[in-house]
Amino acid sequence: GSFATSIQVDPEEFTNDRKTLIGILRSELQPEGPTPLWNAANVAIRELVPQDGRKVVLLFTDGVDSPGNFKTNNLSVMDVMDRATKEDVMIYAIGLESRLPYGRRQAPLGGGGLTGGFGGQGGGGMTQRPDPGLPKIAAETGGGYFELTRADDLRSTFGRVADELHQQYALGFAPTKLDGKTHDLEVKLKVKGMKARARKSYLAAKAPTS
């Protein structure tokens, strides 16, 4: 799907047809307009929930969250993070630095989190980093975050994400507390110098009532 002035889900059914997906990306990406980032991520989760198997959202943007037509019902990164955790959805995020003309700096909702400077590739303008919520939601859900400064790096980054998804391990355990609450989770490796990338919390089931 794509998002800007509106959020579009296309194709209507999930597909692994590479030609179809590339055609959609070329014809429907919306380079101008607002960036309802977290509303779009929420729609992606909603579409994935009924599907069988592992659920992964790949979120790519060159902007910060700006609701546009969704101002009256705008979701925050925390809203989407909570839902992703509850629905067991992993989120990978790719953020691309963008260049804005002088005087048109876009501020993220809630203030803060935006850095930038002048100059760089492509001539004058202001360099804006991607939304600061991207690395947070990726870390919380066990996904990865990649921040790019050049669009030329997109192909290799998408390839890296695909490789990671094909080489993951699934770990499971039976929680001792069945209280229906969210609990912190940490996965550690015994191999020195290695670090696991895993979700930071889990939602325990409720104990059956007699």
Which sequence ranges carry the predicted segments?
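Scaffold/interface architecture of coatomer-like assemblies
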Residues: 1-210
